[in-house]
């Protein structure tokens, strides 16, 4: 029998969602957005909140709504092979390709680089990442409550310090907001919309959804309706907190340009703003907190990805996979944070439209009676367009295709050219399913 989930526990779940999404790695994007957007910071931030806050929480709700046990079973609604391929690519993105290396980069940029001389050699990054990921690997191979205790203890301190930092920045801004940089002078909302992809949160949300469902079931929530309602309420709490923090961080970045100039990445912005307000002690405290927070994130991601790939390839041991992921992440991290962000954008521009389409089709599943053709048509059309978006972002421009897409696809120039084709593909798929039913 289903039990009522208390309001206090819903708040706890909401705070847990906030803590899960407001990771150390994601702190770097709003300040950089603010720096580049300048006087258009509020418009750009609104776009960022859509994909950096709204979409991830919508993804979690969609996962709960689907009633599935994991992402692979949900994605298999498109096709079993797609389920495996999409889930594998997603775990690679939130694992050794981007998210795990990024955690090491952010730790270095905030916890180590500010204390090095300007002419420090790249060897310092190599040494740091080897030590960082060796420790992360060791902890993932030997599961211990220590990492959970440190995480639980550190999270409130980290949030308090970041909250204090942005509060001071709001009360006593470093300087006045400057003119927007190139790329944010027009269509700043859609630029911010795409920048929200960099958080990877809409992809990670499918994994977090499993955690939320299990937590709610332990509290006695068993019916699908109850799970959805409770999840939606918890998501709303997390959304408000995330929106407030991201907006404050964006403003902090925007107001820092007059004094600090345009910096290389968001980690550098955080480090220099912290040093500006709190001196060297503030920089040391921020560096320690971010480094430990990123370490716990890395351990969690290595563990989750290793478990997934071990299930996919049971003949390869969990420990071997964890070691390979750690070594690979070390290599990737040494291209540097700024370059890693640049490399990740083309991939995310290709992946996100597919993920967004899957989210909305999940909510509409009963409307089109779960017909496979609808999923396949919508995601195929979205993928074709998003693939060219990704290629364009990577500097591979096929002028003929870009010219045709610009002429025939609404919103193609702002990165949303896939939207109408995704809808059209779903409609075509539905018509095809009716035709197949009649001819069978």
Curated annotation (Swiss-Prot):
It is a multi-pass membrane protein. It is found in: Cell membrane. Belongs to the branched chain amino acid transporter family. The chain crosses the membrane at residues 9-29, 46-66, 80-100, 121-141, 149-169, 196-216, 227-247, 284-304, 321-341, 348-368, 378-398, 414-434. Keywords: Amino-acid transport, Cell membrane, Membrane, Transmembrane, Transmembrane helix, Transport. The keyword Cell membrane applies. Disulfide bonds: none annotated. Its main location: membrane. One of its GO terms (biological process) is valine transport. It comes from the Bacteria. One of its GO terms (molecular function) is L-valine transmembrane transporter activity. This is Branched-chain amino acid permease BrnQ. One of its GO terms (cellular component) is plasma membrane. InterPro entries: Brnchd-chn_aa_trnsp_Livcs. Branched-chain amino acid transport system which is involved in the uptake of isoleucine and valine. Probably does not transport leucine. Together with BcaP and BraB, plays an important role in the activation of CodY, a branched-chain amino acid-responsive transcriptional regulator that controls the expression of several dozen transcription units in B.subtilis.
């Amino acid at each position: 029998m289903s039990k009522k989930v208390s309001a206090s526990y819903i708040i706890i779940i909401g705070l847990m969602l906030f803590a899960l999404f407001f990771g150390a790695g994601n702190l770097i994007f709003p300040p950089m957005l603010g720096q580049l957007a300048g006087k258009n910071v509020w418009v750009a931030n609104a776009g960022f909140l859509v994909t950096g806050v709204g979409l991830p929480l919508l993804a979690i709700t969609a996962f709960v709504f689907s009633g599935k046990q994991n992402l692979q079973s949900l994605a298999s609604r498109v096709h079993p092979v797609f389920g495996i391929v999409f889930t594998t690519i997603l775990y690679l993105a939130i694992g050794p390709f981007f998210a795990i290396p990024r955690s090491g980069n952010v730790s270095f940029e905030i916890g180590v680089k500010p204390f090095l001389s300007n002419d420090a050699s790249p060897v310092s990054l190599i040494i740091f990442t080897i030590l960082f990921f060796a420790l992360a690997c060791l902890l993932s191979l030997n599961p211990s409550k220590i990492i959970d205790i440190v995480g639980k203890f550190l999270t409130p301190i980290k949030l308090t310090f970041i909250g204090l930092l942005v509060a001071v920045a709001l009360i006593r801004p470093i300087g006045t907001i400057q003119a927007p940089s190139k790329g944010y002078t027009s269509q700043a909302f859609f630029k911010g919309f795409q920048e929200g992809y960099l958080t990877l949160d809409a992809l990670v949300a499918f994994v977090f959804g499993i955690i939320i469902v299990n937590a709610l079931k332990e509290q006695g929530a068993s019916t699908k309706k109850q799970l959805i309602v409770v999840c939606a309420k918890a998501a709303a709490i997390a959304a408000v907190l995330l929106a407030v923090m991201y907006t404050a961080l964006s403003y902090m970045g925007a107001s820092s340009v007059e004094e600090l100039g345009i910096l290389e990445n968001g980690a550098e912005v955080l480090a220099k703003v912290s040093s500006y307000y709190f001196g060297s002690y503030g920089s040391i405290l921020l560096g320690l907190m971010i480094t430990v927070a990123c370490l716990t994130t890395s351990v969690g991601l290595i563990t989750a990805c290793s478990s997934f790939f071990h299930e996919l390839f049971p003949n390869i041991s969990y420990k071997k996979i964890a070691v390979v992921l750690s070594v690979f992440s070390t290599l990737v991290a040494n291209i540097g944070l700024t370059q890693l962000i640049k490399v990740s954008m083309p991939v995310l521009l290709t992946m996100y439209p597919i993920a967004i389409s899957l989210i909305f089709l999940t909510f509409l599943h009963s409307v089109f009676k779960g017909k496979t053709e609808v999923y396949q048509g919508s995601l195929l059309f979205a993928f074709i367009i998003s693939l060219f978006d990704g290629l364009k972002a990577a500097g591979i421009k096929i002028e003929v295709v870009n010219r045709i897409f610009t002429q025939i696809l609404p919103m193609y120039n702002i990165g949303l050219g896939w939207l109408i084709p995704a809808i059209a593909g779903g409609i075509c798929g539905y018509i095809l399913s009716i035709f197949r039913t009649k001819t069978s």
